[in-house]
């Protein structure tokens, strides 16, 4: 049986992991640590958190397989896209999906990311 590595706890809760690694794949969740009322700014911060968490797990954004994006106002998706376009590795484009969702507190965006660790 292959082992599961849990990295954490999350900065939001001592009962959640920041990332989980299993079978050469890491899954991580990120929100913005700044709760400014700008989807663009929160997205930039959350994407930076993703990058840090991937590095902590032993991988990088060029190895991302899939990003599930949750935003509070789907009509503001172009703001997320602007942050994404500035951040994404254009030579290794991952799959992504974006849905509107009710999020906790002042969060405007939440990202669920899976990435490969093994080459």
Region locations from a protein language model:
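N-terminal presequence-like segments and the immediate start of the first folded domain
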Residues: 1-65, 71-119
């Amino acid at each position: 049986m292959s082992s599961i590595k849990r990295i954490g706890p999350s900065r939001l809760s001592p009962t959640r992991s920041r990332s989980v690694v299993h079978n050469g794949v890491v899954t991580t969740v990120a929100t913005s640590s700044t709760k400014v009322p700008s989807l663009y700014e929160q997205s930039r911060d959350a994407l930076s958190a993703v990058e840090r968490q991937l590095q902590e797990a032993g991988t990088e954004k060029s190895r991302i397989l899939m990003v599930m994006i949750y935003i509070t106002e789907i009509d503001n998706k172009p703001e997320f896209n602007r942050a994404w376009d500035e951040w994404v590795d254009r030579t290794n484009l991952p799959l992504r999906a974006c849905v509107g969702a009710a999020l906790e507190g002042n969060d405007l965006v939440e990202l669920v990311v899976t990435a490969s660790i093994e080459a």
